[in-house]
Curated annotation (Swiss-Prot):
Residues 16-62 form the F-box domain. It comes from the Eukaryota. It comes from Arabidopsis thaliana (Mouse-ear cress). This is F-box protein At5g39450. PROSITE patterns: FBOX. InterPro entries: At5g39450-like, F-box-like_dom_sf, F-box_dom. It holds the Pfam family F-box.
Length: 579
């Protein structure tokens, strides 16, 4: 071995040379079992391996391994990106963690955002609560509205856009930044972040990056009113009008869409780089100003404060407020109206502007940001308990069907039998989306199949968002026969359980006995024993439904991301909108 090392192989290790001697196809096969990080680390081991690490064939294989796009689309996407390596980063670090179903508690009819691949992008689409006609769900043109897009840049970087409309019913795009995406993220946050730009230092005549001492106050620590107002200030400033979305394509629906989608992507990349001046620029041009951001002083004044935030002395402000607080406390004591609770409340309220100043002082401007984090969440029957004061979406833990959990996943359906049958007085039926998941009973003696409602297409919420439409004892077969004409269906299984019913008000529904029937074609029917009401469900491919669906205009930007107002009506339906 030593002779081999000192001979023909020179200073190169035998293992390295052996790897280099392998055909590229063999190396690509090996790459399927190696992580992208490990492939990049190969170049640190030996300079001779740099060509292997930069091989397009290896990174094409890595793009396949991510398993978020079919091979045909991966090859199609390559035309707009510098390399498969850059594409692999976008697929693995941006797309894969985000793809899935995201929800919010409000409104009660359902707030479902499905994040799916677009064209060189990730698109968040809100499914509108609606009815479906006699053709059924698969043939229906499902209404949806865009929530956000993340465009893949030429180098694989992520460019964030929030969709929304202004007061004139003009659709706008609001450029922002992707602040961070954790691979196991379960919360998607819309925030404002401070940005510090390079400035010229006259004393030493060179460009320096200003550095702030201390620790920045997180955006989430600001009072809700400041968070809401900052988001409104930024979105109202950086919004860029776009054409009517009904004629726009956000993802391919046919093979002929590639040219149109490439043109739109170029437009979005210019918007992100140049802001409102994008129409007069080329992507190769240099950016001479700071687009898509709001000056800190303007934000400070918009929030009702005077003066230049950079020249304010926080310590003097605190002293003056402490003196005024001491003076007011003395007067209250003299008048006999002193209250410790009021003093504490006053103290907290007076520190809020200082917290805001501390947050804003970390930058020269502010802009939108999207952050995907993993935080500890409690849940009930698979539905996360949410903080309803944060502009956030929560990822549902929808499981793929496996052995013994064959009914897990996303299901859609309507009430009535046979499926799709409508009457003259009711030409459409409310469209329901349910998440089916498995849990153990509280005493641990039974396995339960739970159908959690995440969308309800009625005009007014009849079932609490995130509540169980039915709970099935999956190990307890039912021997009751199907009470209606079978409509040509063969029934394979039936299980006993309970379905939601009127209880103690809207928030606390009761449950009545029922049976879940399973057909050989994969349909599920839950029938309430007393009323004979039938909820018929089928598995859905949301991506395909949305591709052939109808795009409608979004809500104003902040509400479009997360609707924080308690509501039982369909605020997302186009006919209910107000300008």
């Amino acid at each position: 071995m030593n002779q081999m090392r000192n001979g023909d192989l020179g200073s190169e290790s035998f293992g390295t040379c052996l790897l280099l001697s392998l055909p590229e196809d063999v190396i690509a096969v090996i790459a399927r079992f190696v992580s992208p990080r490990d492939i990049c680390n190969l170049s640190l081991c030996c300079k001779s391996l740099c060509d292997v690490v930069d091989s397009e064939r290896i990174w094409l294989v890595q793009c396949e391994v991510v398993k978020v796009l079919p091979l045909s689309e991966i090859i199609q996407w390559r035309i707009g990106i510098s390399s498969y390596k850059a594409l692999c980063w976008f697929l693995g670090e941006v797309m894969k963690p985000l793809v899935g179903v995201w929800v919010h508690q409000n409104p009660e009819l359902g707030n479902v955002v499905y994040v799916m691949p677009g064209f060189l992008s990730v698109v968040g689409c809100r499914i509108i609560p609606q009815e479906v006609g006699p053709l059924g769900i698969e043939e229906a043109r499902v209404m949806w509205s865009p929530v956000f897009e993340i465009i893949c840049g030429f180098d694989g970087s992520a460019k964030f856009f929030l969709h929304g409309r202004d007061g004139k019913v003009q659709c706008c795009l609001h450029p922002g930044f992707v602040r961070g995406i954790e691979k196991s993220c379960n919360v998607l946050l819309l925030e404002v972040e401070t940005r510090r730009e390079k400035k010229l230092c006259n004393e030493i005549d060179e460009t320096v990056l200003l550095v702030e001492t201390g620790v920045q106050l997180p955006f989430r620590k600001l009072p809700f009113s400041y968070r809401r107002n900052l988001l409104h200030i930024v979105t109202s400033t950086v919004g860029i009008p776009v054409p009517d979305l009904s004629s726009e394509k956000l993802f391919p629906t046919s093979k002929d869409d590639e040219a149109v989608l490439l043109e739109r992507r170029t437009m979005l990349l210019k918007m992100h780089k140049f802001g409102g001046d994008w129409n007069h620029m080329n992507l190769e041009d240099e950016c001479t100003n700071i687009p898509n951001q709001v000056d800190i002083n303007k934000s400070w004044k918009h929030l009702g404060f005077e003066g230049d935030i950079r020249n304010m002395d926080a310590e003097n402000q605190t002293q003056r407020k402490s003196f005024s607080r001491y003076f007011r406390s003395g007067i209250k004591h003299i008048l006999g109206r002193s209250s410790s609770s009021k003093n504490m409340s006053s103290s907290r309220s007076e520190t809020r502007p200082l917290n805001l100043q501390k947050f804003l002082n970390f930058g020269d401007s502010i802009g939108l940001s999207l952050k995907a984090s993993n935080i500890k969440l409690s849940s009930y029957q698979g539905w996360p308990n949410m903080d309803e004061t944060r502009y956030a979406l929560y990822k549902l833990p929808i499981k793929d069907p496996i052995a013994n959990d064959e009914y897990a996943g996303l299901w859609g359906g309507t009430f009535g039998w046979p499926p799709g049958k409508c009457t003259e007085d009711k030409p459409g039926k409310a469209f329901f989306l349910l998440m089916l998941s498995y849990e153990e009973s509280q005493d641990g003696t039974e396995r339960l199949l739970i159908g959690t409602k995440i969308l309800e297409g009625t005009h007014y919420g009849m079932h609490p968002n995130g509540s169980a439409m039915f709970v099935i004892k999956i190990d307890s077969p039912s021997f009751e026969g199907f009470p209606f004409d079978t409509n040509g269906e063969d029934f394979e299984h039936s299980y006993a359980g309970e379905g939601t019913a009127k209880g103690y008000g809207f928030r606390y529904p009761g449950y009545k006995p029922g049976t879940l029937f399973v057909t050989s074609k994969g349909l599920l029917m839950f029938i309430w024993k007393a009323t004979k009401a039938v909820l018929t469900l089928q598995r859905l491919n949301l991506g395909e439904l949305l591709r052939k669906g109808v795009c409608v205009s979004p809500l104003p930007p902040c509400l479009n991301f997360a609707y924080l107002i308690k509501c039982h009506t369909n605020v997302f339906a186009p006919e209910r909108r107000r300008s």
